[in-house]
């Protein structure tokens, strides 16, 4: 029977969500990641029958004076301390951010009272970083722009600077700080503070005198490096030009030497027999070399026989046959 009455009450509550009710002031609540937050209800003026809690229109719990009668699955994260109607949400996550609503029902009031909250879950801030954006040194005055930042930029983070060392402490709002320091002035410590609704964090102090001295040293070193680079570039360019000139000169020298040798060879080979080069016919008469024992004699006579080109008729030939005779060595020219 009790379970049936609870169901009837819960059904009536859902039906009354659409009814226009008196609303309280919207409250903003900030919670740290993995931390906890309490949505407080101050309802001492009226007699409360029950309170219904919702998150972005999702039902969370219904609380009566004698305890919780119905609750969603987040029982380990949602509690109602001291038996009151206020709700405590622990183990916060980023997706817990959103709108929370408490509807208060009383028999003494015809309309329900509504209290709304907006929860934002933030991370704890890390140590801020200080970077040098721009620096200059003119007329003995060193001007440096410092910028402070954290890993949680954009999550409702505000920045401020605190300067300690020159009389009273000075404060500057904003992430960027421009300072001017002259040689001989008293140094000061500059500290950046980053803050969000759940935490604040401080940077490591920086000192303008050291920054300016380091900047001057770096500038001198940079100039020295630039001079060295320029001198090296000039030397390299000179070496390249010298190599090109030397290579071109060697090639031209070899060409002139070859031309000179060619001319000298042409002059050393004169035309000794120009009359033989024109219409020169060369006849080669083959001959057969025969050796006989008589060739070894010390006194050998050679006869040159010229055979005339005479053609005799057959009638003039002698009738007696020719008898072969031995001849000495003959060379026919």
Curated annotation (Swiss-Prot):
Residues 276-294 are annotated as: Interaction with FYN when phosphorylated at Tyr-282. Residues 128-203 form the Ig-like C2-type domain. It is a single-pass type I membrane protein. InterPro entries: CD2/SLAM_rcpt (IPR015631), Ig-like_dom (IPR007110), Ig-like_dom_sf (IPR036179), Ig-like_fold (IPR013783). Disulfide bonds join 142-212, 148-192. Residues 27-112 form the Ig-like V-type domain. The modification Phosphotyrosine is found at residues 282, 302. The keyword Repressor does not apply. Keywords: Adaptive immunity, Disulfide bond, Glycoprotein, Immunity, Immunoglobulin domain, Innate immunity, Membrane, Phosphoprotein, Receptor, Signal, Transmembrane, Transmembrane helix. Changing residue 302 to F: Disrupts interaction with SH2D1B, abolishes NK cell activation in presence of SH2D1B, no effect on NK cell inhibition in absence of SH2D1B. SUPFAM superfamilies: Immunoglobulin (SSF48726). Residues 23-224 are extracellular. Changing residue 282 to F: No effect on interaction with SH2D1B, increases NK cell activation in presence of SH2D1B, abolishes NK cell inhibition in absence of SH2D1B. GO terms for biological process: adaptive immune response; innate immune response; regulation of natural killer cell activation. Residues 246-333 are cytoplasmic. Its main location: membrane. Expressed in spleen, lymph node, bone marrow and testis. Lower levels detected in thymus. Expressed in NK cells, B-cells, natural killer cells and activated T-cells. It comes from the Eukaryota. Interacts (via ITSM phosphorylated on Tyr-302) with SH2D1B, PTPN6/SHP-1, PTPN11/SHP-2, INPP5D/SHIP1, CSK and FYN. The ITSMs (immunoreceptor tyrosine-based switch motifs) with the consensus sequence T-X-Y-X-X-[VI] present in SLAM family receptors have overlapping specificity for activating and inhibitory SH2 domain-containing binding partners. Especially they mediate the interaction with the SH2 domain of SH2D1A and SH2D1B. A 'three-pronged' mechanism is proposed involving threonine (position -2), phosphorylated tyrosine (position 0) and valine/isoleucine (position +3). Self-ligand receptor of the signaling lymphocytic activation molecule (SLAM) family. SLAM receptors triggered by homo- or heterotypic cell-cell interactions are modulating the activation and differentiation of a wide variety of immune cells and thus are involved in the regulation and interconnection of both innate and adaptive immune response. Activities are controlled by presence or absence of small cytoplasmic adapter proteins, SH2D1A/SAP and/or SH2D1B/EAT-2. Mediates natural killer (NK) cell activation through a SH2D1A-independent extracellular signal-regulated ERK-mediated pathway. This is SLAM family member 7. It comes from Mus musculus. The gene is Slamf7.
């Amino acid at each position: 029977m009790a379970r049936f009455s609870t169901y009837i009450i819960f059904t009536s509550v859902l039906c009354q969500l659409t009814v226009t009710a008196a609303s309280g002031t919207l409250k903003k609540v900030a919670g740290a990641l993995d931390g906890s937050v309490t949505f407080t209800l101050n309802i001492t003026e009226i007699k409360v029958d029950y309170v219904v809690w919702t998150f972005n229109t999702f039902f969370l719990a219904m609380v009566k004076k004698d305890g919780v009668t119905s609750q969603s699955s987040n029982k380990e994260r949602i509690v109602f301390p001291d038996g009151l109607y206020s709700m405590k949400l622990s183990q916060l996550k980023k997706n817990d951010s959103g709108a929370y609503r408490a509807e208060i029902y009383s028999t003494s009031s015809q309309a329900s009272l509504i209290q709304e909250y907006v929860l934002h879950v933030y991370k704890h801030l890390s140590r801020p970083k200080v970077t040098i954006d721009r620096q200059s040194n003119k007329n003995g005055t060193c001007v440096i722009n410092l910028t402070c930042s954290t890993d949680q930029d954009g999550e409702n983070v505000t920045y401020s600077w605190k300067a300690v060392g020159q009389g009273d402490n000075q404060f500057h709002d904003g992430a960027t700080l421009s300072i001017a320091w002259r040689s001989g002035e008293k140094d000061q410590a500059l500290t950046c503070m980053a803050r969000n609704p759940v935490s604040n964090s401080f940077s490591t102090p920086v000192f303008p005198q050291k920054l300016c001295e380091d900047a001057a040293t770096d500038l001198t070193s940079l100039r020295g490096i630039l001079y060295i680079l320029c001198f090296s570039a000039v030397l390299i360019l000179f070496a390249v030009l010298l190599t090109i000139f030397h290579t071109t000169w060697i090639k031209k020298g070899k060409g002139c030497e070859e031309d000179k040798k060619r001319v000298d060879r042409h002059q050393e080979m004169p035309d000794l027999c120009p009359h033989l080069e024109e219409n020169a016919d060369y006849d080669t008469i083959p001959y057969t070399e025969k050796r006989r024992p008589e060739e070894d004699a010390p006194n050998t006579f050679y006869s040159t026989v010229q055979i005339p080109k005479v053609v005799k008729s057959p009638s003039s030939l002698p009738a007696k046959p020719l008898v072969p005779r031995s001849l000495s060595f003959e060379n026919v020219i």
